[in-house]
Amino acid sequence: MTVLIHVLGSDIPHHNRTVLRFFNDALAATSEHAREFMVVGKDDGLSDSCPALSVQFFPGKKSLAEAVIAKAKANRQQRFFFHGQFNPTLWLALLSGGIKPSQFYWHIWGADLYELSSGLRYKLFYPLRRLAQKRVGCVFATRGDLSFFAKTHPKVRGELLYFPTRMDPSLNMMANDRQRKGKMTILVGNSGDRSNEHIAALRAVHQQFGDTVKVVVPMGYPPNNEAYIEEVRQAGLALFSEENLQILNEKLEFDAYLALLRQCDLGYFIFARQQGIGTLCLLIQAGIPCVLNRENPFWQDMTEQHLPVLFTTDDLNEDIVREAQRQLASVDKNTIAFFSPNYLQGWQRALAIAAGEVA
């Protein structure tokens, strides 16, 4: 049987590194279909840190796409597992027959599913991408994204799968012992990316709570984002006093980020698509409830796991937040499907499906 090849078709260092390390540490030892990768971006020590994997790096999207298409045409039994899919050339290859549906398996990352960009080239490309998506052999996604995808592509097979968030299961019960009182701290957004709609989120938080809460805005990623960070800072200072606004413009190491999250009382995410599942997982693990946009389909995954969900359209106050914290504290977090190690079973099944080992 031909070994499955995994494709990271866009240079997204943080997510690509997470996926590679997860496969190296959790999957490669038990499956030959978890070892071959084609990745856009620089090695930057990844090969050394992932010795169980065979990783081929490409300088750009186009060069990777050309290599994938050549492999697909040379051997129609060759299957590919696309993790996120931000590579237009690959979509066009699927649409034109360069890559066959039986060769194309796609793990939706959220941002690559929704049509939120307003630029002309995106508006021209989106209809073609929708046509190509009808030809995918199988999609893997959160419950909410599967539901969203099925509305336009009901005939495409869908399987539940969660991004492998880096988590320490031993911390699942730690939050239950913490006493929460005094001024609330609210985390706004999961990164410095504009898709977090930071300014709109800050205004929404201020409308709900006024200048009575401390707001923390992590903006250390992506790099070279100084102009937008300053824009958010000025908008924040027009709403909150200086001591109540903390904008982080340095990228935090994992343990420092975890410590930051555990100081919060609430996470506030205004974006209308599924994203930031890693931050949501870490907040929930710490017993911190999250406010979501009702258009963000991840609320379906949360309610399926019996987790409290607050919405941006709700009338929020401290009593409601504390009640959500109490409800979250009563949940057995060891049973949550999108937590580590529970998501591992979904990945093992996904590999078997994509490799053609199970129907």
From Swiss-Prot:
It comes from the Bacteria. GO terms for molecular function: 4-acetamido-4,6-dideoxy-D-galactose transferase activity; fucosyltransferase activity. The keyword Glycosyltransferase applies. GO terms for cellular component: plasma membrane. It holds the Pfam family Glyco_transf_56. The keyword Membrane applies. Its main location: membrane. GO terms for biological process: enterobacterial common antigen biosynthetic process; fucosylation. It is found in: Cell inner membrane. Pathway: Bacterial outer membrane biogenesis; enterobacterial common antigen biosynthesis. It catalyses: beta-D-ManNAcA-(1->4)-alpha-D-GlcNAc-di-trans,octa-cis-undecaprenyl diphosphate + dTDP-4-acetamido-4,6-dideoxy-alpha-D-galactose = alpha-D-FucNAc4-(1->4)-beta-D-ManNAcA-(1->4)-D-GlcNAc-undecaprenyl diphosphate + dTDP + H(+). Its EC number is 2.4.1.325. It is a peripheral membrane protein. Keywords: Cell inner membrane, Cell membrane, Glycosyltransferase, Membrane, Transferase. Catalyzes the synthesis of Und-PP-GlcNAc-ManNAcA-Fuc4NAc (Lipid III), the third lipid-linked intermediate involved in ECA synthesis. Belongs to the glycosyltransferase 56 family. HAMAP family: WecF_RffT. This is TDP-N-acetylfucosamine:lipid II N-acetylfucosaminyltransferase. It comes from Escherichia coli O17:K52:H18 (strain UMN026 / ExPEC). The gene is wecF.
